[in-house]
């Protein structure tokens, strides 16, 4: 059966296995004990007429992912296939192997400027030497991440506009590093220093830092402890504060030591306290 493939521009063309063979071969380069032909063979079973190029990419990813249980190195192959899809989304064009590094660095500068304009990133990020930072990106470090790592970053951490991600992994690490360096005297040097630390996975900041560093709501702390007063005003003021912290991924700890115990007298209402448990 002649399967038609729907391109991003809506045009239909006949499916040829050569393109997905090439994608699988690139994804498996330098990875031991994985077979690009097996990935392609299983992916072909999922094809159908008028399938989109994105759905073909997903079929390849799923095919590689299903093999991780038998051979863990398929996690790196699946990661590379997912990265290929991610790059297309970030670059907003096809990935050209000859100009890939240029596309990558260009996307970093463009995304910082675009996200500042959209009020998603702190305008002080424009004070950094963006061309210098783009040249400091070690693009090959994308290969350090396994499939689950890339998928988690894609689903939860990369900034999105109009439901499209705006950051490739090294751009993401650099954005986080810039946010951490924003008040440094040598902000460019410190950003590169932080970037080299976290992009090599020698240290990974906590989730709130990854979410919010460099953004217009730079809440970087993981956990907060708040003491609630034993009064209507204290309880609802505390709840409001906790909601604000939780909104930007802060972890919450409640000190309820001041709460009166079950059966204690409430002077204001001439009632009896139900204690802590019903309130919780």
Language-model-derived ranges and their functions:
Residues 1-280:
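Extended catalytic cores of very large enzyme megasubunits
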């Amino acid at each position: 059966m002649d399967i038609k493939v729907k391109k991003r521009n809506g045009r239909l063309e006949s499916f040829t296995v050569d393109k997905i063979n090439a994608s699988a071969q690139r994804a498996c380069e330098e990875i031991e004990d994985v077979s690009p032909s097996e990935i392609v063979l299983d992916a072909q079973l999922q094809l159908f007429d008028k399938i989109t190029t994105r759905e073909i990419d997903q079929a390849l990813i799923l095919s590689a992912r299903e093999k991780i249980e038998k051979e863990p190195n398929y996690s790196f192959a699946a990661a590379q296939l997912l990265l290929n899809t991610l790059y297309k989304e970030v670059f907003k064009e096809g990935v050209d192997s000859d100009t890939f590094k240029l596309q990558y660095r260009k996307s970093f500068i463009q995304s910082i400027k675009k996200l500042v304009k959209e009020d998603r990133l702190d305008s002080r990020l424009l004070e950094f030497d963006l061309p210098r930072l783009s040249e400091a990106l070690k693009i090959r470090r994308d290969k350090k991440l396994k499939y689950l790592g890339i998928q988690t970053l894609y689903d939860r951490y990369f900034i999105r506009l109009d439901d499209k991600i705006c950051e490739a992994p090294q751009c993401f690490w650099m954005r986080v590093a810039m946010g951490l360096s924003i008040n440094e005297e040598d902000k460019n040097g410190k950003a590169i220093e932080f970037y080299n630390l976290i992009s090599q996975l020698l240290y990974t900041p906590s989730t709130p830092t990854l979410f919010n560093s460099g953004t217009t709501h730079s809440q970087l702390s993981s956990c907060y402890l708040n003491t609630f007063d034993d009064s209507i005003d204290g309880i609802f003021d505390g709840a409001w504060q906790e909601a604000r912290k939780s909104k930007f991924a802060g972890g919450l700890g409640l000190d309820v030591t001041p709460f009166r115990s079950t059966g204690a007298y409430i002077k204001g209402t001439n009632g009896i306290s139900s204690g802590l448990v019903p309130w919780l």
